[in-house]
């Protein structure tokens, strides 16, 4: 009887803690945003993890994933969510712990539409955000994560903008369900974006380590992106950087929109970017 009572109490406590986390997140999302110039200072040298969400998603896209990443981690990683507006303004929400060496910055865009033309615009907006972050924190190295089209934005940034940031090195990039050949099902049917990525592959940083996560939810893809489109990333990265690896995630939680919160994916993120 005691064991049953204790088990029930534990379940109730877990539900209550989950409720508190959800409530805290809702409150955080409703807090007013601040101009990017008001970003708090750090008391330590940082190597941030900078994340880019996919099309139609906002800077809040990774809230649940970061909660899972922080579970059991001491201390927790700070989460700063930055939004780049079409008029070049930048605002942020979140709190930076003064001694957090690996804070998480998420950069979202007002223009979060799909299509190669918009992806190039988003890469320019991301570059502007990187300039502001470097001016504020003077970091020389960072790691990145891109979900879906966020991985494409990162690819454009690496090939077109990174070299302009003197003394900056990108150590690792983790992409999740990134469609390097957009909606095509055959690698032989290359879209102009993939052609550009392959043409400019020599501009990729040679020291970069890349982990590409592919979801198999239904037949040959994650329900949104075809397997071959994600695998086309090897045409861009393999042999041009320090390492390129692909990991396949299967099952009910391998749908395109579920992948960032997938427990296996969270473990891979923790191992690859936080390890």
PLM segments and residue spans:
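Polybasic, lysine-rich low-complexity intrinsically disordered segments
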Residues: 10-11
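Lipid deacylating catalytic domains
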Residues: 19-145, 152-275
């Amino acid at each position: 009887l005691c064991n049953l009572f204790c088990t029930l109490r534990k379940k109730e406590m877990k539900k209550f803690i989950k409720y508190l986390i959800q409530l805290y997140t809702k409150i955080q999302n409703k807090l007013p945003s601040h101009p990017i110039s008001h970003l708090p200072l750090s008391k330590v040298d940082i190597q941030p993890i900078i994340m880019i969400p996919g099309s139609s998603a906002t800077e809040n896209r990774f809230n649940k994933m970061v909660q899972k990443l922080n579970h059991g981690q001491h201390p927790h990683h700070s989460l700063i969510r930055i939004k780049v507006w079409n008029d070049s303004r930048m605002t942020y929400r979140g709190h930076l712990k003064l001694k957090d060496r690996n804070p998480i910055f998420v950069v979202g865009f007002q223009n979060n539409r799909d299509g190669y033309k918009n992806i190039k615009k988003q890469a320019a907006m991301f570059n502007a955000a990187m300039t502001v972050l470097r001016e504020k924190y003077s970091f020389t190295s960072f790691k990145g994560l891109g979900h879906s089209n966020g991985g494409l934005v990162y690819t454009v940034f690496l090939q077109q903008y990174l070299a302009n940031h003197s003394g900056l090195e990108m150590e690792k990039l983790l992409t999740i369900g990134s469609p390097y050949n957009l909606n095509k099902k055959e690698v032989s049917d290359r879209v102009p974006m993939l052609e550009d990525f392959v043409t400019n592959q020599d501009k990729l940083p040679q020291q970069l380590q890349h982990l590409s996560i592919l979801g198999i939810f239904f037949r040959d893809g994650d329900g949104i992106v075809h397997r071959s489109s994600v695998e086309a990333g090897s045409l861009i990265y393999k042999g041009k950087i320090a390492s390129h690896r692909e990991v396949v995630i299967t099952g009910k939680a391998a749908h395109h929109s579920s992948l960032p919160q997938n427990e296996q994916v969270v473990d891979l993120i923790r191992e690859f970017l936080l390890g």
